[in-house]
Amino acid sequence: VVLTSNRTRELSDALRRRCLYLWIDYPSFEKELRIVLRKVPGISQLLAEQIAAFMHLVRRLDLQKVPGVAETLDWSLALLRLHRDHLDRTSVEETIGCLFKHHEDQRLVRGPWLDAALAAIHEAQRDGEGLARALSRIERTLKA
């Protein structure tokens, strides 16, 4: 038997004593990229990289509900069905409900952070730096 918890309410001590505990963190950029490429047939490498990078960065924000891999896949499918080949402000605005279920989270992402994050992602791809290597630099830039 496998029990899962999204931490919306605490499990009792008695139940915890009878269980083995395993914490599964959000995937790395590389792992999430592989998941998107495998689970979303037809998605381009470029868009999949941008999505994985965006998700990596958005999970660093102080959100009420951090989107998980299920939301990443829903969002990827929505973007693909809308025939998007790259992330831009319009694409994010039109599909933001796939990722964020709280208005406050949507408002936070729609602010100046969105333009800065997208610009940094596109710049890293243009420069050939590689998003995996660029993410820590981008994180520092967005915090400043």
Regions found by a protein language model. Name each.
Residues 1-144:
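C-terminal regulatory/interaction module of P-loop NTP-utilizing enzymes
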